[in-house]
Swiss-Prot record:
Similarity-based family: Belongs to the universal ribosomal protein uS8 family.
Function summary: One of the primary rRNA binding proteins, it binds directly to 16S rRNA central domain where it helps coordinate assembly of the platform of the 30S subunit.
Gene Ontology biological process terms in this record: translation
InterPro entries referenced in this protein's UniProt entry, alphabetically: Ribosomal_uS8, Ribosomal_uS8_CS, Ribosomal_uS8_sf
Name under which the protein is recorded: Small ribosomal subunit protein uS8c
Any one GO molecular-function label of the UniProt entry: rRNA binding
Natural source organism: Cyanidium caldarium
Compartment list: Plastid, Chloroplast
Quaternary structure annotation from Swiss-Prot or TrEMBL: Part of the 30S ribosomal subunit.
HAMAP family recorded: Ribosomal_uS8_B
One Pfam family named in its UniProt record: Ribosomal_S8
Record's keyword annotation contains Cytoplasm: no
UniProt GO cellular component terms: chloroplast; ribonucleoprotein complex; ribosome
Length: 133
């Protein structure tokens, strides 16, 4: 059993990208599903689907690669910020811009999981889950 499902998912995605896999299997949790929805909406992954096997389920994520250079993935860096031992919370004014707006910060708010720019526009803060660029 994994204590931090977000770190596990990010590590699986990172390893699949390094190995240039087309798809990767990730454990099914609500937070993982919501993070993948944000990644799909932002164009970092193609899509994902929910599959059930016996009592447990998993997410099958289709990775997206650059259309010009098939070796270059759309996801290059996945950095976990908040962790179980040290949660990182921010107010609206302190939400960081990742790489000057090139990357995204994924934030868990009271309104759900969203990017940092959307949370900033809505005027709500939350827990910074990870940075992606």
């Amino acid at each position: 059993m994994v204590n931090d499902s977000i770190s596990d998912m990010l590590t699986r995605l990172r390893n699949a990208i390094c190995a240039q896999h087309k798809v990767v299997q990730v454990p099914l949790t609500n937070i993982n599903k919501n993070i993948l929805k944000v990644l799909q909406k932002e164009g970092y992954i193609k899509n994902f689907e929910i599959l059930f096997e016996r009592k447990s389920g998993y997410l099958l994520v289709s990775l997206k690669y650059n259309s010009l250079n098939q070796d270059k993935p759309c996801l290059s860096v996945l950095k976990k910020i908040s962790r179980p031992g040290l949660r990182m919370y921010v107010r609206t004014k302190k939400i960081p811009k990742v790489l000057g707006g090139t990357g995204i910060a994924i934030i868990s708010t009271s309104k759900g999981v969203m990017t940092g720019s959307i949370a900033r526009n809505l005027g709500i803060g939350g827990e910074i889950l990870c940075y992606i660029w």
